[in-house]
From Swiss-Prot:
Subunit organization: Homodimer.
Chain's role: Catalyzes the hydrolysis of N(2)-succinylarginine into N(2)-succinylornithine, ammonia and CO(2).
Protein name (record): N-succinylarginine dihydrolase
UniProt cross-references to InterPro entries, sorted A to Z: AstB_sf, SuccinylArg_d-Hdrlase_AstB
Pfam families, A to Z: AstB
Catalysed conversion reaction: N(2)-succinyl-L-arginine + 2 H2O + 2 H(+) = N(2)-succinyl-L-ornithine + 2 NH4(+) + CO2
Enzyme class per UniProt: hydrolase
Record-annotated active site: E174, H249, C370 (nucleophile)
Origin organism lineage: Bacteria, Pseudomonadati, Pseudomonadota, Gammaproteobacteria, Enterobacterales
One GO BP annotation of this record: arginine catabolic process to succinate
UniProt-listed Enzyme Commission number(s): 3.5.3.23
Keywords assigned by UniProt, alphabetized: Arginine metabolism, Hydrolase
Keyword Flavoprotein part of the UniProt annotation: no
Family membership: Belongs to the succinylarginine dihydrolase family.
Amino acid sequence: MSGYEVNFDGLVGLTHHYAGLSFGNEASTQHQNSVSNPKLAAKQGLLKMKALADLGFQQGVLPPQERPHVPMLRKLGFSGSDESVLAQAMQQSPRLLSALSSASCMWTANAATVSPSADSADGKVHFTAANLNNKFHRAIEAETTSGVLRAMFNDPRHFAHHEALPQVALFGDEGAANHNRLGGDYGKRSVQMFVYGRQEFGGEIAPTRYPARQTREAGEAIARLHQLDEQHTVFVQQNPEVIDQGVFHNDVIAVSNQNVLFHHQQAFYRQQQALDEVRRKMATLDSELVAIEVPTTRVSVADAVATYLFNSQILTKPNGKMMIVVPEESRQHSGVWSYLSEMVASGGPIDEIKVFDLRESMRNGGGPACLRLRVALNEQELRAVNPRVMMNDSLFITLNEWVDRYYRDRLTQNDLADPQLLREGREALDSLTTILGLGSVYPFQQ
């Protein structure tokens, strides 16, 4: 196989808590005000990273961001010492403090959209940090995300970085969670599929209950920035009816790997027409789409959302067959598990299931696919990645010790005003940037 898919998982931050901040994400809303366990959340994520690295997959780590985000609190009128800022925010607007303490950057599928060098006219890997315009607690992530990505992929001969799109609804961009790449080997030109929820200019249909976070206009802008060939680029609208049922990103209803698209029967608007265009464009690259469509009669949209069946990872094994990585919730649901078991026994491309317990992330609405950013790289590009962010035995031990030293095993919203939590977080992140060799990427380090 030419090239590699490298998954960069987000390390859960110290302020991981359940605040119900994400309207349209039903798991997030349902678990509002529950007590969280940041230490367990971080360790569950690390176990997934290490298990996949041990199986021979290329696996990296993306660090959490500084939270509470004191600079934004100051911008919004809170003043005095950092301790005073936190106390004022808790007294006057605890919901605002909660939003500015969110650990949502753990879901690195929303960190950026990435286009491999094989698809870009200049032969470079392109990164555009997502503006995450639809949710305030996420829109503040883009600047630090850009800095972290530049520190990890810092060789301009191989990597091109773009700032997030303008911070307005017209260009609402949720990153790789609404982006699929379909083709053959990772190192060869493929078709990029940008999925959107609404089209600002000339759109026909949009959801009515929950917001469509991604626009077609955002996808088109990223395709231009990344110098993609329109002959191998597809823009597909997600079915607005499933957005209104809690499918807030496309990776909650579909997932791809190489030439395989695993998706629900109701995933896309005018689905047959959309997939026909993907097939035609893949055919020009001598690649054939394998669409695995799950019928509503087997798995309802509600069950897909509850179990995160499609918020899974599909990984290509050395023998060419594929493995699907699902959360424990998929195994606990008899109908979903029955479907998965039949699928892997059917002789198709996916012949193995791997299950992970990601309960802390799942209760906030993020499964295996949410936690990772896919980056397809060739041999030279992989060598140019900052090696200290790549998972191995040594890094796994170091990061677990780091979590043990700094993380709490119980956190509620009231704890967010604790100045000691802020100090713990800054000390932890200062140490982490040394471990991962990132330099000064956080506001408090500037």
